[in-house]
């Protein structure tokens, strides 16, 4: 190549470079290689997961299929159940003969299948609170106590129709005598009419025909103690007298007998012509009126 041709080639290259620089559409694209990033963390994690899954599959596929003998009863009737606590190092087996679990590399479980040890629990003893509560129950059958409110509050109204031969008797003493011999009943006599009201049942009252014929008066002279039981049978009625304290006026036995005969005759007269109030009051107050009983 001579000097003229070299110069011409040099001009041609210069023109080509100026034309490319003046053209706005002609761009020079320079591609740079991407930066190198380290992706070792994600790849190692995925590879480790895959390795674990492979190990699990290989371990489960390579587990012993032959039956293991039970360490308790040495029976071959056993089966593989699962891995203890999801650990591949301790597989769990079940003995079908003695129904016990055991783990390879662990200890034999004495608890049978289904929790049989819970069935042998003793029943709890009854609490002391329940037994004490039964002992402290209230009494549903309290003792029946009679009270004589009407006679104690106003005894004069109760005995206004009672013709007593002995004026030394007081009404409270007569109430006590009537309660002592007729079973501690409470009476309530409505005076002024023909009505008589009893608050006690008639089955608790025991009558006798002639009460004052054999029962002397009290508080008339001196006292004598007598403990005896008199049983008088008349028309299937029984009267018991126990521990009564009697007062005699003078100590003369003949005077007392005469006094009783007078009262007995007076009672017969009242029985013939007396009113029903006197009759009932004689029954309630110990037979002072001398009237009959039935």
From Swiss-Prot:
Record key words, sorted: DNA-binding, Metal-binding, Nucleus, Transcription, Transcription regulation, Zinc, Zinc-finger
Gene Ontology, cellular component aspect: nucleus
Subcellular location(s) of the protein: Nucleus
Biased composition (Gly residues): 284-294
Superkingdom, natural source: Eukaryota
Main location class: nucleus
InterPro entries reported for this sequence: Dof (IPR045174), Znf_Dof (IPR003851)
Ranges of compositional bias, category Basic and acidic residues: 251-273
Comp. bias (Polar residues): 126-136, 157-173
Disulfide bond keyword on record: no
Transcription regulation among keywords: yes
Pfam families linked to this entry: Zn_ribbon_Dof
Binding site for Zn(2+): 70, 73, 95, 98
PANTHER family assigned: DOF ZINC FINGER PROTEIN DOF1.4-RELATED, DOF ZINC FINGER PROTEIN DOF4.1
Role according to the record: Transcription factor that binds specifically to a 5'-AA[AG]G-3' consensus core sequence.
Full protein name: Dof zinc finger protein DOF4.1
Organism this protein belongs to: Arabidopsis thaliana
């Amino acid at each position: 190549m001579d000097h003229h041709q070299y110069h011409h080639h040099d001009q041609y290259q210069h023109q080509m470079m100026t034309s490319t620089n003046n053209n706005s559409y002609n761009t020079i694209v320079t591609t740079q290689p991407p930066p190198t990033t380290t992706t070792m963390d994600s790849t190692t994690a995925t590879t480790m997961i895959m390795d674990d899954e492979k190990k699990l599959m290989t371990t489960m596929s390579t587990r012993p299929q032959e039956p293991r003998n039970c360490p308790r009863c040495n029976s071959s009737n056993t089966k593989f159940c699962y891995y203890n606590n999801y650990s591949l190092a301790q597989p769990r087996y079940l003995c079908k003969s003695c129904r016990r679990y055991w783990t390879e590399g662990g200890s034999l479980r004495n608890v049978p299948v289904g929790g049989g040890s819970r069935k042998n629990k003793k029943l709890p003893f009854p609490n002391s609170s329940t037994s004490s509560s039964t002992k402290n129950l209230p009494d549903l059958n309290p003792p029946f106590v009679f009270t004589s409110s009407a006679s104690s509050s106003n005894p004069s109204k109760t005995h206004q129709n009672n013709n007593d031969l002995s004026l030394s008797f007081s009404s409270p003493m007569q109430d006590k005598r009537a309660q002592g011999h007729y079973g501690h009943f409470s009476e309530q006599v409505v005076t002024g009419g023909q009505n008589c009201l009893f608050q006690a049942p008639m089955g608790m009252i025991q009558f006798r025909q002639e009460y004052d014929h054999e029962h002397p008066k009290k508080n008339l002279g001196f006292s004598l103690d007598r403990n005896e039981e008199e049983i008088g049978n008349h028309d299937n009625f029984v009267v018991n007298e126990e521990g009564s304290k009697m007062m005699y006026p003078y100590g003369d036995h003949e005077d007392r007998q005469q006094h009783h005969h007078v009262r007995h005759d007076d009672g017969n007269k009242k029985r013939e012509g007396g009113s029903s109030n006197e009759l009932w009051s004689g029954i309630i107050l110990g037979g002072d009126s001398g009237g009959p009983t039935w």
